[in-house]
């Protein structure tokens, strides 16, 4: 498997004020590589393939490093009022050093804007939430993740 130079890609993306978003499906849900450690801003995983491991549930995971400045002027969905939330401006509420971040103990160099917007708007509009049973199945799959990754890596 060829692993991209995430640090170089992150530097290029950040020099242009855009986030580095990585599909880490082949990274075995972070068991093989953790792109955030190399500068990725957002990482997505297929929970179906590695976390579940048995094809019994369909799901995915979005992980936000909390490091990207979504308020840099290039992402109006974060910096302009949201009609669906009575004019809420996501960046004002959940950007660096926002009252919400302070209340939650988020370090001043981190933000939760991407995660908050995903929960507030995407979850509301598309309903992408796991059922309790599917969550249980994924937790069961996690119990054998390290063994499965070890065996796949040996093969």
Positions of the model-derived regions?
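Conserved PLP-enzyme active-site core in the AAT-like
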Residues: 1-155
């Amino acid at each position: 498997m060829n692993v991209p130079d995430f640090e170089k890609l992150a530097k290029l993306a950040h020099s242009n004020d855009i986030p580095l978003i990585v599909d880490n499906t082949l990274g075995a849900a972070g068991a093989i590589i953790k792109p955030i450690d190399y500068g990725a801003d957002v990482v997505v995983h297929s929970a179906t393939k590695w976390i579940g491991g048995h094809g019994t549930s369909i799901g995915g995971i979005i992980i936000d490093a909390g490091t990207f400045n979504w308020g840099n002027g290039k992402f109006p969905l974060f910096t302009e009022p949201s009609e669906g939330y009575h004019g809420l401006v996501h960046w004002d509420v959940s950007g660096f050093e926002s009252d919400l971040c302070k209340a939650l103990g988020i370090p001043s160099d981190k933000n939760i804007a991407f995660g908050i917007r995903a929960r507030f708007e995407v979850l509301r509009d598309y309903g992408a939430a796991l059922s309790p049973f599917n969550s249980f199945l994924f937790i069961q799959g996690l119990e054998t993740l390290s063994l499965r990754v070890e065996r796949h890596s040996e093969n």
